[in-house]
Amino acid sequence: MFRWSWCRLIISKVSAESYVDYLQNSDRELPALSEIFPRHGTGTGELVKFHSLLCEAMKDHNFNYVGIKVVPPTSPPLQCLRATEPVCVPIFSNSFQGSVFSAKQHRIQFVEPLFVIRLGRDPPTQLTANTVPAVCDAFFPGVEFVGSRYPFYPPHTTGFAADLGGCVAVHLGEAVSLGSASLESLGDTNFVVTRREEPIQVGAGKNCLGGPGAAVALAVSYAASMGWPLREKHYIFCSGVGSRSPALAGEYKVNYGAYGSVSASLT
């Protein structure tokens, strides 16, 4: 039994390393994602273990673990997969690549707005939505470029989560201190997404699990279950706050009005 468990751990580490090669767009031949990712239907424990080993592998490759992305079941990708529960995935420093991207080179399929919170201190491993504001210090408007390491789209929620929710790149605007704005009022604030100065969608932070408080609490809990707890200066990336827009060339801007904006371009 011990030998079987040890062999399985080694295989899991190899799988995480192989996925790092996918994230780095390696030229060498890689195993199919179905051979790397946890099997669908095996339960959340295998996915949590994969994410934990991936955090370790990314650290070995000098990519910092920067936070957790929360994807609600109301988001377009999870609705397509008929998911009933939210998905959490770790995000790493390789996602922060500047503000100009190539849809073809980076295999970007969609552009999505983000509602991003930064922790101002180490949180306890269990939070409630009411106690979340005490550990948060800043809000950032964000934009995410989304694709898939699958040939087209993930076939199920396990694949979606193992593939980090399709995250290719993230770009953030300037920080807004939560001393000057409450978390819930920010969550109620509508934003507008434009492409080439033409509005293409609207949304609000509350579209992620009803408000940022619930999203932060879930992210903190999931990070603790991975064995990689969130710390001061880590981020919570609230996804599903708007719709997905097809990745077309042009400058995209997510505008929160008085709470700032962020711009990034696709070529």
Curated annotation (Swiss-Prot):
Name of the protein in its database record: REH2-associated factor 2
Observed effect of gene inactivation: RNAi-mediated knockdown at the procyclic stage does not cause defects in RHE2 interaction with H2F1 or their association with components of the RECC and GRBC editing complexes; however, causes a slight decrease in the association of the GRBC complex with the RECC complex. No defect in mitochondrial mRNA editing.
Coiled coil: none
Keywords for this protein: Mitochondrion, mRNA processing, Transit peptide
Localization per Swiss-Prot or TrEMBL: Mitochondrion
Summary of the function given for this chain in its UniProt record: May play a role in mitochondrial mRNA editing by facilitating the association of the gRNA-binding (GRBC) complex with the RNA editing core (RECC) complex. However, appears to be dispensable for mRNA editing per se.
Entry-linked InterPro entries: Fumarylacetoacetase_C_sf, Hydratase-Decarb/MhpD_sf
PANTHER family: 2-KETO-4-PENTENOATE HYDRATASE, ACID HYDRATASE
Subunit description: Component of the REH2-associated complex (REH2C) composed of helicase REH2, associated factors H2F1 and H2F2, and mRNAs at various editing stages; the formation of the complex is RNA-independent. Interacts with various editing complexes including the RNA editing core (RECC) complex, the gRNA-binding (GRBC) complex (also known as the MRB1 complex) and the RNA editing mediator (REMC) complex.
GO molecular-function term, one example from the UniProt record: 2-oxopent-4-enoate hydratase activity
Gene Ontology biological-process entries: mitochondrial RNA processing; mRNA processing
Any GO CC annotation of this UniProt entry: cytoplasm
Family matches, as Gene3D superfamilies: Fumarylacetoacetase-like, C-terminal domain
